[in-house]
Amino acid sequence: ELENEGLVEYVRNAGCSVKEITFEESFEIYLMRANYEIMAVRLLGGKIPEETLQEMEEILERMKSLNVDEYDQLFSYDNKFHSCLIRMTGMKSLYKAWKSLNYGNIVTGYNLASDKKAVIKRQYPIHKELLEACKSRKKEEICRVLSDHYMGTIHRLLKEQGMTEADTKFSLDFLIS
């Protein structure tokens, strides 16, 4: 099942390992996730339902108290947190398309886990900022924070791989506005 979800690769006579993911694959996944989430916010005009905000707050609190031994839960919480924005639309096909990208977030997280403590530490404040923007119910503010959230990840991936935008075939000005 994990192989079908794209999380692990099986090599005959060698066993299973976490799938390697290229920058281009990560870029594509984050491009799509960001645009789906921005679209969800725009569909509701930024009016995030109270129950969605409550769920996001609960997930954020769990994320806040993670330690290095619980690193594997970080990306599960991240996916749950962001899924709130998609699920609030009630659009099943949108949710299915968004959810199909979860593996990329998980694999990217595991492949770049050189400093798990630093990764855990930065997750709370960036998700707190997103939650606060959602609480404002200001559509453009929420979309800006979402864009910054995903662009921060893209720029961090580039830096960690010793790359710049010039090293990619993509423009990093890709989010819908």
Which residues fall in each region the model found?
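Hydrophobic, amphipathic alpha-helical faces that serve as interaction scaffolds
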Residues: 32-47, 79-117, 153-156
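Short linear motifs at protein or domain termini
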Residues: 1-46, 162-167, 171-177
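C-terminal all-alpha effector/ligand-binding and dimerization domain
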Residues: 58, 64, 103, 111-177
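Amphipathic coiled-coil alpha-helices
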Residues: 36, 59, 66, 70, ...
